[in-house]
């Protein structure tokens, strides 16, 4: 009640005050109107030529304006410049765009670009001259073009190709800040874009830029990091050293050379490798790197290259911006600096598109806008110090998000350095350790990061947002960084494209940047050099593909291992459950399938056709069983692959238990080509595993089809823990989630860790006094129908794949499984070694899905697809 009384007493006072304010405002408003009218009338009475304006009078020594103001070069020293001298005569020489004030200006020799009436004739107009000064619709405001044909002006017989890189532009930026980037967002809307483009590992600037113009993995083209040492050259490479211009570092054939070798000209405005005489040649036109050159000047120069006479004009161009990478390092990916940088690069990109439109090239040029990698936030309290693991640091370390360790004394100790001991000392040391140490050959095969002497043998795979460094003296933390696992969402890069060759208003699934080189060759209609990409896998980006892929032709034909005798000629295998030859003959007779049974098992267990063998001189035969089919390699004495289909769990009864300690010889395989059971003695670290799991059989009798020597593969005992858990638990889970899966699995031999199948002589080197070679890896490819209402064997459309390439090692130290059940680490281990079907093909010499009724280019999309499990950014 007291507060209400107080309020009532104050109201009269407030009303009086309000009345005074109203009167004061009315008086001020009246005065403002009078002053405005006075100024307007006063100015209106003066003649324009006596206003003292420098418009069209800049640096005219004879001009005298109002009160004798001047516009000549010395007016500032005299202090008699006209009021608009700075804006008209000085500022106009510093900007790259027109405005209404500049339109029709007197030509200024010092201008960056011109808005004078004769600029079109003299080819020095600012990029937006037509839209600002002649009233044409700007590129940004123009509707998306939907013409099916190229709209090139006279003199442009074929569309030029512009490759534009914005360093460190992570894909998420375009989703989060799209409204702040109207020009780039329009390109995304009108053209084609991927959800993201995957960078190669390590996700660094030089390796990925060179990969983009090469189609090669860093291990193949030699630029394996921004900083590296080559023991053969005995030199160090860094971004700040002159060594980066030494052609000895740069292997392969970059895009500009591919174009030049086939009669085209190429121009690069900054690109890693363009300043080195690779194969003895530079690009037709190139600019030495200078980070201080304004983005607008770079764009203006590229536009001038497009103005060159036809005989001199390049067909292929590159453009490079350091942003938003520079700002991302300084402030982190979520910062005001990055937002400002995105606006700057968007403005510069808009200048390019406006300049193209002014030349009527905006629907003629094929332009690709991409990035080399993304950006991750780092923190100074997320650092792993090697001094916490070693009492003394006696090695050299490349620090950061993708660390490598080598000998400190080089070249003397380079090859003798004990890398294995370093990895052991860094493995499973802490429960909350934020990196995994690897010997480089043991890294996930999908990375293709091993076969190069510049890749040091010790590698640390670091958790997101963490850095690994030598000691606490390293304070280079905070802000942003990159180089991490290329599956991290923060490392995802942008890819957008627009032009007469590209589809419009389309989003495509992610792909890897090794595929861009082949795409650019197709745009230029030239033949690519050999590369790691899969030619034709990006045909779905194009309106009319230039290259039509076909399935690889099989190199080694198969035979059928025939059934001759129901009893083995000789055998050292035992199966106590088969007590006499009659029982043995009965189960062996099950291997003798009729043609109808063969047709039935092929339909279910090879729904996409058998894998074709692309290795030379491989003697192999097909072995048919009711529950699986395998391709048996006679020289290796083991199956090269086995294929079977696991139905959805609800479609089958509980599986019968497996008969223990039962093995017998496969009577279809001669003893000279078969494994012996005595090979797997208890005193060895090797035991036998089954490529097709006997427990997957639907009846107790049919499991005997799997308990045979032709289904055996050698496995380390520790590896079988992981292998068995996958087949008994995870495989059932995947089949349940996907309405059944087709499984193809087999051994891999990659002793020289080059990512390709080993030749027989390479395998023979590693037999170690045994007749059976030990695989370096095993692969598993799960295939299901993308439409989960269909099973694999009756899938009418697109397929889904889940391939794994699992290292075959004596220990499971990678997963630190001590005291943990398999449920806590096996699935994570498989996930860490996810791969593409194409990776499996390269490592096995097999070719998949040849009988799937689908265009080959779509099959290649499937083969180059890499499943990911990352959700955090």
Curated annotation (Swiss-Prot):
Cystine residue pairs: 54-71, 58-89, 69-82, 75-81, 98-115, 103-133, 113-126, 119-125, 144-190, 152-364, 380-477, 428-816, 561-621, 573-677, 575-662, 785-795
Keyword terms: ATP-binding, Calcium, Cell membrane, Disulfide bond, Glycoprotein, Hydrolase, Membrane, Metal-binding, Multifunctional enzyme, Nucleotide-binding, Repeat, Secreted, Signal-anchor, Transmembrane, Transmembrane helix, Zinc
Region annotation Nuclease: where it falls in the sequence: 580-873
TM spans (from-to): 12-30
Cofactor: Zn(2+)
Cytoplasmic side: 1-11
GO cellular component terms given for this protein: apical plasma membrane; external side of plasma membrane; extracellular region; plasma membrane
Gene3D superfamilies in the record: 4.10.410.20, Alkaline Phosphatase, subunit A, Extracellular Endonuclease, subunit A
SMB domain residues: 51-93, 94-138
List of glycosylated residues: 236, 279, 290, 425, 532, 592, 685, 697, 787
Entry keyword Ligase: no
Residue intervals on the Extracellular side: 31-873
Protein EC: 3.1.4.1, 3.6.1.-, 3.6.1.9
Active site: 205 (nucleophile)
UniProt motif (Cell attachment site) ranges: 78-80
Post-translational modification: N-glycosylated. N-glycosylation is necessary for normal transport to the cell membrane, but is not the apical targeting signal.
UniProt-listed Pfam families: Phosphodiest, Somatomedin_B
Cofactor detail note: Binds 2 zinc ions per subunit.
Top-level taxon of the source organism: Eukaryota
UniProt protein name: Ectonucleotide pyrophosphatase/phosphodiesterase family member 3
Species in which this protein is naturally found: Pongo abelii (Sumatran orangutan)
Gene: ENPP3
């Amino acid at each position: 009640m007291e507060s209400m009384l107080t309020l009532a007493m104050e109201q009269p006072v407030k009303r009086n005050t309000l009345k005074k304010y109203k009167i004061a405002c009315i008086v001020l408003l009246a005065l403002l109107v009078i002053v405005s009218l006075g100024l307007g009338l006063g100015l209106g009475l003066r003649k324009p030529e006596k206003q003292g304006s420098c418009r069209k009078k800049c640096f005219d020594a004879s001009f005298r304006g109002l009160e004798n103001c001047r516009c000549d070069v010395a007016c500032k020293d005299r202090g008699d410049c006209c009021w608009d001298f700075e804006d008209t005569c000085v500022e106009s020489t510093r900007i790259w765009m027109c405005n209404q004030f500049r339109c029709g200006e007197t030509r200024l020799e010092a201008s960056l670009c011109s808005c004078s009436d004769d600029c079109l004739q003299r080819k020095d107009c600012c990029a937006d001259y037509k839209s600002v000064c002649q009233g044409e619709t700007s590129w940004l405001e123009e509707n998306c073009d939907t013409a099916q044909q190229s709209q090139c002006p006279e003199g442009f017989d074929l569309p030029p190709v512009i490759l534009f890189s914005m360093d460190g532009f992570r894909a998420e930026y375009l989703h989060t800040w799209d409204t702040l980037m109207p020009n780039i967002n329009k390109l995304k809307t009108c053209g084609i874009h991927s959800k993201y483009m995957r960078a190669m590992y390590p996700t660094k600037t030089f390796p990925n830029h060179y990969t983009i113009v090469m189609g090669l993995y860093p291990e193949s083209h030699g630029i394996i990091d921004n900083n590296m040492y080559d023991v053969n050259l005995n030199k160090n490479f860094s971004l700040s050293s002159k060594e980066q211009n030494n052609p000895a570092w740069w292997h392969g054939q970059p895009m500009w050379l591919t174009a030049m070798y086939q009669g085209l000209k190429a121009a690069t405005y900054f690109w890693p490798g363009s300043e080195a005489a690779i194969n003895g040649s530079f690009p037709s036109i190139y600019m030495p790197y200078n980070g201080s050159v304004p983005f607008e000047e770079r764009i203006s120069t590229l536009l001038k290259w497009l103005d060159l006479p036809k005989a001199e004009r390049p067909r292929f161009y590159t453009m490079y911006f350091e942003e938003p990478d520079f700002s991302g390092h300084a402030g982190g990916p979520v910062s005001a600096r990055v937002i400002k940088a995105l606006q700057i690069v968007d403005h510069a990109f808009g200048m390019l598109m406006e300049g193209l439109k002014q030349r009527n090239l905006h629907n003629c040029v094929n332009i690709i806008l991409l990035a080399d990698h993304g950006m991750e936030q780092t923190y100074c309290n997320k650092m792993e110090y090697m001094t916490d693991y070693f009492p003394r640091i006696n090695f050299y370390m490349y620090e950061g998000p993708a660390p490598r360790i080598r000998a400190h004394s080089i070249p003397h100790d380079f090859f003798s350095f004990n890398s294995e001991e370093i990895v052991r000392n860094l493995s499973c040391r802490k429960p909350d350790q934020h990196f995994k140490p690897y010997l480089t050959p043991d890294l996930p095969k999908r990375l293709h990061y091993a076969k190069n002497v510049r890749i040091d043998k010790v590698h640390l795979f670091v958790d997101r947002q963490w850095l690994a460094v030598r000691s606490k003296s390293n304070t280079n933390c905070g802000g942003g960084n990159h180089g991490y696992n290329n599956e991290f969402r923060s490392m995802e890069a942008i890819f957008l494209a627009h032009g007469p060759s590209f589809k419009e208003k389309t989003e495509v699934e992610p792909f890897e940047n090794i595929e861009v080189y082949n795409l650019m060759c197709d745009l230029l209609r030239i033949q690519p050099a050999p590369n790691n990409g899969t030619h034709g896998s990006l045909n779905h980006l194009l309106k009319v593909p230039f290259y039509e892929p076909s399935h690889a032709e099989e190199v080694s034909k198969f035979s059928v291992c025939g059934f001759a005798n129901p009893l083995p000629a000789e055998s050292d295998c035992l199966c106590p459950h088969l007590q006499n030859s009659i029982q043995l003959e009965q189960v062996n007779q099950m291997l003798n399938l009729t043609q109808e049974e063969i047709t039935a098992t092929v339909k279910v267990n090879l729904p996409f056709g058998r894998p074709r063998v692309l290795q030379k001189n491989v003697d192999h035969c097909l072995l048919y069983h009711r529950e699986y089919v395998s391709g048996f390699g006679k020289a290796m004495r083991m199956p090269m692959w086995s294929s079977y289909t696991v139905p959805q769990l609800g479609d089958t009864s509980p599986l019968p238990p497996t008969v223990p300690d039962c093995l017998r010889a496969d009577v279809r395989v001669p003893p000279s080509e078969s494994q012996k059971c005595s090979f797997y003695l208890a005193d060895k670290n090797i035991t036998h595993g089954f490529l097709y799991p006997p427990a997957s059989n639907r009846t107790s009798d049919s499991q005997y089809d799997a308990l045979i020597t032709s289904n055996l593969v050698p496995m380390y005992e520790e590896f079988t823990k992981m292998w068995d858990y996958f087949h008994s638990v995870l495989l059932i889970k995947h089949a349940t989630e996907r309405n059944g899966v087709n499984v193809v699995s087999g051994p891999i031999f990659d002793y020289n860790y080059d990512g390709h199948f080993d030749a027989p002589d390479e395998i023979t080197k590693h037999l170690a006094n045994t007749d059976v070679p030990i695989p370096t890896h095993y692969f598993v490819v799960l295939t299901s129908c993308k439409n989960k209402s269909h099973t694999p064997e009756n899938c009418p459309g697109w397929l889904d794949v889940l391939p794994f390439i699992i290292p075959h090692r004596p220990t499971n130290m990678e997963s630190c499984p001590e005291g943990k059940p398999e449920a806590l680490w096996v699935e994570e281990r498989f996930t860490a070694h996810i791969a593409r079907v194409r990776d499996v093909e390269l490592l096995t010499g097999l070719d998949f899905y040849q009988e799937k009724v689908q265009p080959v280019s779509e099959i290649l999309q499937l083969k180059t697809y890499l499943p990911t499990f990352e959700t955090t950014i």
